[in-house]
Amino acid sequence: MHNPQLTKDGKLKHLLTTEGLPRAILNQILDTAESFVGVAEREVKKVPLLRGKTVCNIFFENSTRTRTTFEIAAKRLSADVITLNVSTSSQSKGETILDTIDNLTAMHADMFVVRHAESGAAHFIARHVAPHIHVINAGDGRHAHPTQGLLDVFTIRRYKPDMHNLRVAVVGDVLHSRVARSEIHALTTLGVPEVRVIAPKTLLPQHVEKLGVHVYHDMREGLKDIDVVMMLRLQNERMNGSLLPSAQEYFKCYGLTPEKLAFAKPDAIVMHPGPMNRGVEIDSAVADGKQSVILPQVTYGIAVRMAVMSILAGNSE
């Protein structure tokens, strides 16, 4: 079956999910991102790869961090950037998604960065855009958030280059997390031998083992001999009903404290896709501690998004 993210000759056309992306393309994105890391240190933080191109950030769902890093990434590539907060624009007046897309296409946009609360929205848009337009999924419902998954993997690779001897633990609200799915698909494709998920049963999707992960419900047991600890935000806004007794109870069992982190390897790194709930899924002593690479993740996010945009622009037919 043809992958809708790829051109007929196997190049990247859209970035919608890490699921099903060939290892060669994942490595191409990570290697290209490596070349962009130094751009932020230059006096002139620009490269001309997207000069003359227009990138539209279309956010049907709010996100300060993701929107800002995509904006910075596009501007560092010298693109013209339009940011549309659709919740306050024509959508709220009854315009459909396709109307919005058609209007932006008529303005000769070249790339759409789309965030939407509905799973599958980015795939839907990619199916309906003009042939010259590239679509990047900036998060769709619970489904996928590929650039976040890739920037997490990029961060892991910088601190732990030997991906074939790694144990990674993803901890927390896996059920509602599009980041967890994107990250797990990327890690397993890149050959990481052991990915664990640690969560209460109520916060795990059905048949999660099919993703190729080992499931743990006890934090201390799950963190034993781990190299990378990825904490997930407790997503209160996506929860229906009482999946948890209380935030305090959750922190007691699944919050990452120095005491729990001691079960991982002494040189383990701690990650979080943000925004953090301090005192819910992570203790401040850990978030601000020497094993935390949470702020470098944000920095690398710009390089990874620059890489994705430049590869897509280079693959224009």
Curated annotation (Swiss-Prot):
Gene3D superfamilies: Aspartate/ornithine carbamoyltransferase. It catalyses: carbamoyl phosphate + L-aspartate = N-carbamoyl-L-aspartate + phosphate + H(+). Carbamoyl phosphate binds at residues 65-66, 115, 145, 148, 274-275. Disulfide bonds: none annotated. One of its GO terms (biological process) is amino acid metabolic process. One of its GO terms (molecular function) is aspartate carbamoyltransferase activity. Pfam families: OTCace, OTCace_N. Keywords: Pyrimidine biosynthesis, Transferase. Pathway: Pyrimidine metabolism; UMP biosynthesis via de novo pathway; (S)-dihydroorotate from bicarbonate: step 2/3. It is an enzyme of class 2 (transferase). Its EC number is 2.1.3.2. L-aspartate binds at residues 93, 178, 233. GO terms for cellular component: cytosol. InterPro entries: Asp/Orn_carbamoyltranf_P-bd (IPR006132), Asp/Orn_carbamoylTrfase (IPR006130), Asp/Orn_carbamoylTrfase_sf (IPR036901), Asp_carbamoyltransf (IPR002082), Asp_carbamoyltransf_Asp/Orn-bd (IPR006131). Heterododecamer (2C3:3R2) of six catalytic PyrB chains organized as two trimers (C3), and six regulatory PyrI chains organized as three dimers (R2). Belongs to the aspartate/ornithine carbamoyltransferase superfamily. ATCase family. Catalyzes the condensation of carbamoyl phosphate and aspartate to form carbamoyl aspartate and inorganic phosphate, the committed step in the de novo pyrimidine nucleotide biosynthesis pathway. PANTHER family: ASPARTATE CARBAMOYLTRANSFERASE, ORNITHINE CARBAMOYLTRANSFERASE, MITOCHONDRIAL. This is Aspartate carbamoyltransferase catalytic subunit. It comes from Methylobacillus flagellatus (strain ATCC 51484 / DSM 6875 / VKM B-1610 / KT).
